[in-house]
Curated annotation (Swiss-Prot):
<dbReference type="Pfam" id="PF03449">
    <property type="entry name" value="GreA_GreB_N"/>
</dbReference>
<keyword id="KW-0804">Transcription</keyword>
<dbReference type="GO" id="GO:0070063">
    <property type="term" value="F:RNA polymerase binding"/>
</dbReference>
<dbReference type="InterPro" id="IPR028624">
    <property type="entry name" value="Tscrpt_elong_fac_GreA/B"/>
</dbReference>
<keyword id="KW-0805">Transcription regulation</keyword>
<dbReference type="InterPro" id="IPR022691">
    <property type="entry name" value="Tscrpt_elong_fac_GreA/B_N"/>
</dbReference>
<dbReference type="InterPro" id="IPR036805">
    <property type="entry name" value="Tscrpt_elong_fac_GreA/B_N_sf"/>
</dbReference>
<dbReference type="Pfam" id="PF01272">
    <property type="entry name" value="GreA_GreB"/>
</dbReference>
<dbReference type="GO" id="GO:0003677">
    <property type="term" value="F:DNA binding"/>
</dbReference>
<dbReference type="InterPro" id="IPR018151">
    <property type="entry name" value="TF_GreA/GreB_CS"/>
</dbReference>
<dbReference type="GO" id="GO:0006354">
    <property type="term" value="P:DNA-templated transcription elongation"/>
</dbReference>
<dbReference type="GO" id="GO:0032784">
    <property type="term" value="P:regulation of DNA-templated transcription elongation"/>
</dbReference>
<keyword id="KW-0238">DNA-binding</keyword>
<comment type="function">
    <text>Necessary for efficient RNA polymerase transcription elongation past template-encoded arresting sites. The arresting sites in DNA have the property of trapping a certain fraction of elongating RNA polymerases that pass through, resulting in locked ternary complexes. Cleavage of the nascent transcript by cleavage factors such as GreA or GreB allows the resumption of elongation from the new 3'terminus. GreA releases sequences of 2 to 3 nucleotides.</text>
</comment>
<dbReference type="InterPro" id="IPR036953">
    <property type="entry name" value="GreA/GreB_C_sf"/>
</dbReference>
<protein>
    <recommendedName>
        <fullName>Transcription elongation factor GreA</fullName>
    </recommendedName>
</protein>
<dbReference type="InterPro" id="IPR006359">
    <property type="entry name" value="Tscrpt_elong_fac_GreA"/>
</dbReference>
Length: 159
């Protein structure tokens, strides 16, 4: 797995998710398996089979999260001093069609959440913004065609 950028907050969120899966979910599933064993014949025991499936899925999630954490490149965005857009930038854009301002922060793909205006570094809008500076006009290609934005401000602050 290739290394990928992530903010400190995103890294801690993945760590918390891993701890929950290992120490809460795993324990609950183990208890469910033990309880299901008490129902008798395991070959026809739906509760046992369901608990074993949940165990398998949980273990896969744990494995995936451990790999993500091992390959994460944690970026402390508040220490970035740049006037051009890179990973971690909070950008203020003016949509040239609607004349509305929008604010996004460019984060890692595992921490992107459009409801919080956190966009993945791999998203089309982030890719169009990388390397740009305040005052630049950006074209973002979407399924509905091109959209144009003016980049008003670039900041490196925590979200």
């Amino acid at each position: 797995m290739a290394r990928f950028p992530i903010t400190i907050k995103g890294f801690h969120k993945l760590e918390q998710e891993l701890k929950h899966l290992k120490y809460v979910e795993r324990l609950k599933i183990t208890t469910d398996i033990s309880t299901a064993r008490e129902f008798g014949d395991l070959s026809e025991n739906a509760e046992y089979k369901a608990a074993k499936e949940r165990q398998l899925l949980n273990d896969k999630k744990i494995y995936d999260l451990e790999n993500k954490l091992a390959n994460a490149e944690v970026i402390e965005i508040t220490k970035i001093n740049s006037n051009s857009v890179k990973f971690g930038a909070r950008v203020v854009l003016l949509d040239l069609d609607t004349e509305k301002e929008v604010v996004y922060q460019i984060v890692g793909e595992y921490e992107a959440d459009i409801t919080q205006n956190l966009i993945s570094i791999a998203s089309p809008i982030a890719q169009a913004l990388i390397g740009k500076k305040a005052g630049d006009i950006i074209e973002v290609i979407t399924p509905k065609g091109g959209r144009f934005y003016e980049l008003l401000k670039v900041q490196y602050v925590d979200f």
